[in-house]
């Protein structure tokens, strides 16, 4: 069991977040694993690796769930994946810096399902706001808090 590790649901993770994670992995010597259904560009590093999974619905998510441990952090905007990660005792952080917790994950799942129902009935709900500098800063702050806690 590795004490600390960061997993990334990498297919949908914004590039500025991946770049930040690459730097953090090197700076703090924390293993970083990007999981995607396509090859990614990752810098050469003993701390950074990638896993290419087959294409298909939730294949990357399932790989992460199968390998995550309680001391790990998962970066994902996928709320059902975050729920599974939390069930396993690990932490989940979205690319906008919001930490998913046992206190907020049920509400997030309910809202996600509600919005999905609206979309399937033909209601246009719009998408998330464009990824902003404020989102990047919020993510950096949340990541730094986790890194400080685990690297004491």
UniProtKB/Swiss-Prot annotation:
Belongs to the UPF0178 family. It comes from the Bacteria. This is UPF0178 protein Shewmr7_1635. It comes from Shewanella sp. (strain MR-7). PANTHER family: UPF0178 PROTEIN YAII.
